[in-house]
Design a protein with these regions (language model features):
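Conserved alpha-helix/loop element of class I SAM-dependent methyltransferases that forms part
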Residues: 28, 32, 42-62, 77
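A short acidic, Gly/Pro-enriched loop at the edge of an enzyme's catalytic core
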Residues: 127-138
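C-terminal alpha-helical "lid/dimerization" subdomain adjacent to the S-adenosyl-L-methionine
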Residues: 171-226, 230, 236
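A short SAM/SAH-binding and catalytic strip from SAM-dependent methyltransferases
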Residues: 137-151, 174
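A short glycine-rich, Lys/Arg-flanked "PGG" loop and its adjoining helix->strand segment in the class I
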Residues: 152-167
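Core SAM-dependent methyltransferase catalytic element
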Residues: 224, 230-253
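Class I SAM-dependent methyltransferase SAM/SAH-binding core
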Residues: 63-128
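N-terminal auxiliary segments of SAM/dcSAM-dependent transferases
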Residues: 1-24
Length: 253
């Protein structure tokens, strides 16, 4: 790969094409997004998201930006947990902004989102977020960073929009560290997920890309270094389900 090309799954394509090609993938799977995550995680993505929310520990008055937020399910979990705290302790309600470059993904989540008064949907690019500096307490991105063309640029944007003391949480598929688990998951991913995608959505190609994009994503240690390079402190990560997914976090200090 040279500076003029970038990975799109296992393909090498011109850098300027990736954003549109990724958008086309998610246009094609928007109506089946939750089923897609079920297929790629054995249905465990819901548990991973709940564990992520527990780690975040949402509080009243906090402002969340959920980048690549799609249908808004993570933002909904954030607001629900923050509201439970508010009911016990008092204070103002939390607010969430679901930001996604793909309007079809945002539209797919309209009917699913509760607490509509406290949640807004914004069409925007992770590499150039439509938010001012120092405006958010928490920024999340779940299963989205691997699809971003320039991940380092996006991480720098995340740092920009967070307030001092703000927290970043990145949930992403990863490569299992155990060789036996990796072999099993690779066999499942490459042999069955595209077939499931074809069965559920008539779209094997998009699911093939999503599987390949996981294998092209940096290791846990390398991605942690990328987060630190963007300015974050106290960067750490936790593997879920043997490393099928990983939660990364860091602070803007």
């Amino acid at each position: 790969m040279n500076k003029n090309t970038i990975d799109f799954g296992y393909q090498e394509i011109p850098v300027e094409e990736k954003k549109e090609r990724v958008k086309n993938v998610f246009d094609s799977v928007a109506g089946k997004y939750d089923l897609m995550n079920d297929a790629m995680s054995f249905g465990v993505h819901r548990l991973w998201k709940n564990l992520t929310i527990t780690k975040i520990n949402p509080q009243p008055r906090e402002i969340l930006i959920d980048v690549a937020g799609g249908t808004g399910d993570l933002a909904h979990r954030f607001l629900k947990r923050a509201e439970a705290v508010r009911v016990r302790r008092g204070g103002e309600s939390a607010t969430a902004y679901v930001c996604d470059i793909n309007d079809q993904m945002l539209l797919a989540g309209i009917d699913q989102i509760k607490n509509k008064n406290n949640i807004s949907r914004v069409c925007g690019d992770a590499q150039k977020l439509p938010f001012p500096d120092n405006c958010a307490d928490v920024l999340t991105i779940a299963f989205g960073i691997r699809n971003v063309t320039d991940r380092q640029s996006a991480l720098t944007e995340f740092f920009r929009v967070l307030k001092p003391g703000g927290r970043l949480f990145v949930l992403e598929f990863s490569t299992p560290e155990d060789k036996n688990l990796r072999k099993i998951y690779d066999t499942y991913s490459f042999s069955f997920i595209p077939k499931i995608g074809n069965l559920l959505a008539g779209n094997a190609e998009s699911y093939q890309y999503l599987v390949e994009s996981i294998r092209r994503f940096p290791s846990q240690n390398k991605f942690s270094i990328m987060i630190e390079t963007s300015g974050f402190s106290k960067v750490s990560f936790r593997n879920f389900s043997g490393g099928i997914a990983t939660l990364y976090w860091g602070w803007k200090i």
